[in-house]
Each structure stands twice: as structure tokens, then as C-alpha cells.
């Protein structure tokens, strides 16, 4: 791994703001007056993870982190997808999307070493069957930062036997579900996985490079196995794009797995402005609703990866907007406007030749955001701490996404509610040298 911490990456980003403040941007490339839709074969999806949404959590590293951390919200049963999967999948079906991302919790299907749970697998059998019956394709995440408590007792990713333990379980998952023709995400956001393990005490800081090497080994091995069980499979490991510092943050991991990616999985959420550069790390940790939204940043993010992986399919595996307990954002952005603006820039990217094949909204419902119920990302909002019924209440983005999925994009003459950022710090040098603008 290239030596890097969140502080290092964000310090570089802050430095970039100083340099670019004096930069003179090039003239924006011509913008088409209207844009075609993204096509009938485009993947419109919603996303969730097991631990964050299922509830009824078995013993795991994250169950332990939550139970022992004094500042984390109590988990309870989260939004109880475990008992409400059928109605939640129906909500996704009614949006008109065609892809549903879930996670298979290792701790649920293998509660003890060498022993798999028939009950655990039966739950996921029902979930995947319901997704397919609703006319959607599953996207299965094998590892979304959670592993069994017995594996934590062995040292987690510091354990030399971790990769073989991991592969034994993941092969069982692949054997069971390859016939459902899912898309696959092997490991969710490897860099964030590393950071969370260190800050929660699951990994000594000295073992970060070891964990990254083991994550890469695990990805590369299960990639090959998936292709033996599901010829033509689409497999990735999604990366969380870090504005202005992505080559440093994610470059090392991508170098290790680049040969075994059928599509590039990308998570994009925030822009980066000079006003918040110095506080970016603190906001990202516990006040993410204060981070700036920058819908046009998704265009520069896609262009960054299109240049890094020429011709490779690009899929936005996660994108969304946080609020603080559902309150209006200080910047006035609504969930519907942010979604429509983002999709406009997806269409611009496709029109400019980028091989964009899919987009997942994070998330279908609010969920447990790794220690807190305060950040709300859901198309459907849920007041976990005040509403025992866990009522799913639609936000304004539900109707917006339904129209987008139906039309495969925003209308041809749509104009974003916010102009593109001059010399965007999302991809600083490129956005100054080759910026994009709006028609007129």
C-alpha cells in the first residue's frame, strides 16, 4: 500500500485548494442542448448492506464495536430488513429499478468455524428469490466490513489464516448463489475497511499494509472462483472515491487487483470545497451532512476512472445524500434535486464516451451508519429511535427516481439546479484543464 492515512490524503487535498485558487481554468468543453437517456440495458439500482439494515445481528466484529463503544448509537435491530425484506423489495420493485444490491453476512451464514447455518442461508435464499421474482437482478456483496466474532478472536485480518477462512465461506456463498446470475462485489471500499478496523481496534496500525495485501489476495482468488462457477460473471471491488487524493488513497489497492475487475465499482458522494477542506476528515467521520454536495463531481470521477481503465465498464455502486435526522440541508439541496442533477451528469459522461453501465442509490431506506442513526440516506426515511413501527416514509426522491428509471434518465432538456464547479477539487488538475459546462 502507498503510505497513506485519511489525514495525509486530506492534507494533500487542502494543499490543492491553495494551488488551484490561483489557477485559470480552461474554456469549458461544448455542452449538448439535449441528452439521450442511458438506454434500456442500463442498471438502475438500490443498495443496502447486511449489518446496516438487517438487524438481529449475530456475533461479529461490528457487533462488538457497537456494544463496546460509548459514543455509538445502540444498534437494536436497525431497520429490521430481516423481517421486512419482502415489503422493502416491493418498494424497490415499485420504483422500477432493475438491480438490488445486498450483502451476505459471513457472521450469519457461518456462526462457528467449519459450520454453516442452514437458517442463515435460508434467509438469503428467500431474499434473492424475492429480488428475482420482482424482476430485478441481485448484486451480491461478499464482504461489507463485517466478519464473525470467532474470526475476530483469531485476530481478524492480522491473522495469517484469515484469507483461507474468508475464502472457505465465500466459496460456499458463490456455490449457492451463482445460479441466480448476480453481479458481484467482493470487498466493499477496501480503504475505508482498513481505516475502520484500525480506529475500532480490530487491527493494529502496523498491520495496515498486511491487511491490504490480504484483501487483494482474497479478491483475486474469489474472482477466479466466481468465474469457474458463473462463466461471464461481472465481478468488482468498489472503491470510495476521495476527492483530490484518490490515486494516493485507492491507487495501491487498484494496482493489486486491476487485472481482475470486470467492471469498475465506484462510490461517489461528496465534492470538496476550499471552505471545508481543513475540516473534511472530521465531517466525513461524524457530520457527513455538512460535506458539500457536488453533482457534477460524479462526471469528473467517472472520467478519472475511464482514463485509469480505458474501455472498462464503469458502475456507480453507491451514491446518495445525507441529511441530519431528515432535517433540510443547510445548502437547500433536496434529495430529489440532488438525484436528478447527478443523473444529468451520468448522461453527460455517457454522451462523452464513458462506458457507464449502472447506478445504485444508497440507500433504499435509512439504516445504521456505522455507529449512528443520525445520517439519513434513504429514499424512504425511518425514525429508528422514535418509531417502534419502523415506518417507511417516502422522500421526494421516490417519485424522482421512479421517473428516472422509467425514462432511463432525466428529460433531454433538463438543466441541473446547480452550475458545475470551476476547477473542481474532485479531480483538480483535470477539471481545470478540461472543464465541463452547461448549455447556453
Q: Positions of the model-derived regions?
A:
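Secretory targeting and sorting signals
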Residues: 2-28
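Catalytic domains of carbohydrate-active enzymes, especially glycoside hydrolases
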Residues: 84-105
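Short catalytic helix/loop segments, enriched in acidic residues and glycine
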Residues: 61-82
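Active-site region of glycoside hydrolase catalytic domains
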Residues: 31-67, 113, 122-330, 337-439
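Internal amphipathic alpha-helical repeat/solenoid segments
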Residues: 81-87, 111, 120
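Glycine-rich, proline-tolerant flexible connector loops at the mouths of alpha/beta enzymes
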Residues: 106-116
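Acidic/polar N-terminal loop/beta-strand segments that form early-domain functional surfaces
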Residues: 47-49, 103-107
Amino acid at each position: 500500500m502507498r503510505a497513506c492515512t485519511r489525514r495525509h490524503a486530506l492534507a494533500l487535498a487542502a494543499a490543492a485548494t491553495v494551488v488551484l485558487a490561483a489557477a485559470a481554468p480552461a474554456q469549458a468543453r461544448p455542452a449538448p442542448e439535449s441528452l439521450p437517456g442511458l438506454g434500456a440495458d442500463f442498471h438502475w439500482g438500490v443498495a443496502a448492506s447486511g449489518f446496516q439494515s438487517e438487524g438481529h445481528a449475530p456475533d461479529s466484529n461490528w457487533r462488538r464495536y457497537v456494544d463496546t463503544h460509548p459514543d455509538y448509537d445502540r444498534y437494536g435491530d436497525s431497520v429490521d430488513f430481516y423481517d421486512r425484506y419482502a415489503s422493502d423489495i416491493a418498494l424497490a420493485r415499485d420504483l422500477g429499478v432493475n438491480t438490488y444490491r445486498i450483502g451476505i453476512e459471513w457472521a450469519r451464514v457461518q456462526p462457528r468455524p467449519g459450520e454453516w447455518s442452514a437458517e442463515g442461508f435460508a434467509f438469503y435464499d428467500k431474499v434473492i428469490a424475492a429480488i428475482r421474482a420482482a424482476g430485478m437482478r441481485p448484486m451480491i456483496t461478499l464482504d461489507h466490513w463485517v466478519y464473525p466474532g470467532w474470526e475476530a478472536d483469531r485476530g481478524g485480518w492480522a491473522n495469517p489464516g484469515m484469507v483461507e477462512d474468508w475464502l472457505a465461506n465465500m466459496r460456499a456463498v458463490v456455490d449457492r448463489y451463482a445460479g441466480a446470475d448476480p453481479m458481484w462485489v467482493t470487498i466493499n471500499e477496501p480503504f475505508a475497511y482498513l481505516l475502520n478496523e484500525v480506529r475500532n481496534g480490530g487491527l493494529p496500525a502496523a498491520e495496515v499494509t498486511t491487511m491490504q495485501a490480504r484483501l487483494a489476495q482474497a479478491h483475486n482468488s474469489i474472482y477466479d472462483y466466481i468465474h469457474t462457477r458463473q462463466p461471464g460473471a461481472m465481478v468488482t471491488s468498489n472503491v470510495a472515491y476521495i476527492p483530490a487524493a484518490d490515486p494516493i488513497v485507492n491507487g495501491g489497492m487498484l494496482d493489486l487487483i486491476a487485472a481482475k475487475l470486470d467492471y469498475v465499482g465506484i462510490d461517489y458522494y461528496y465534492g470538496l470545497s476550499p471552505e471545508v477542506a481543513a475540516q473534511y476528515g472530521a465531517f466525513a467521520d461524524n457530520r457527513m451532512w455538512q460535506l458539500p454536495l457536488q453533482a457534477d463531481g460524479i462526471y469528473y470521477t467517472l472520467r478519472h476512472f475511464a482514463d485509469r481503465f480505458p474501455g472498462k465498464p464503469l458502475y456507480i455502486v453507491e451514491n446518495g445524500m445525507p441529511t441530519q435526522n431528515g432535517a433540510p440541508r443547510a445548502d437547500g439541496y433536496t434529495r430529489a434535486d440532488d438525484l436528478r442533477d447527478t443523473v444529468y451528469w451520468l448522461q453527460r459522461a455517457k454522451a462523452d464516451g464513458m462506458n457507464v453501465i449502472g447506478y445504485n442509490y444508497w440507500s433504499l431506506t435509512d439504516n445504521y451508519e456505522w455507529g449512528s442513526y443520525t445520517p439519513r440516506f434513504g429514499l424512504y426515511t425511518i425514525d429508528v429511535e422514535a418509531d417502534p413501527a419502523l415506518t417507511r416514509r417516502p422522500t421526494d426522491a421516490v417519485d424522482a427516481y421512479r421517473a428516472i428509471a422509467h425514462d432511463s434518465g432525466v428529460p433531454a432538456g433538463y438543466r441541473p439546479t446547480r452550475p458545475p464547479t470551476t476547477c473542481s477539487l474532485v479531480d483538480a488538475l483535470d477539471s481545470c484543464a478540461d472543464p465541463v459546462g452547461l448549455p447556453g
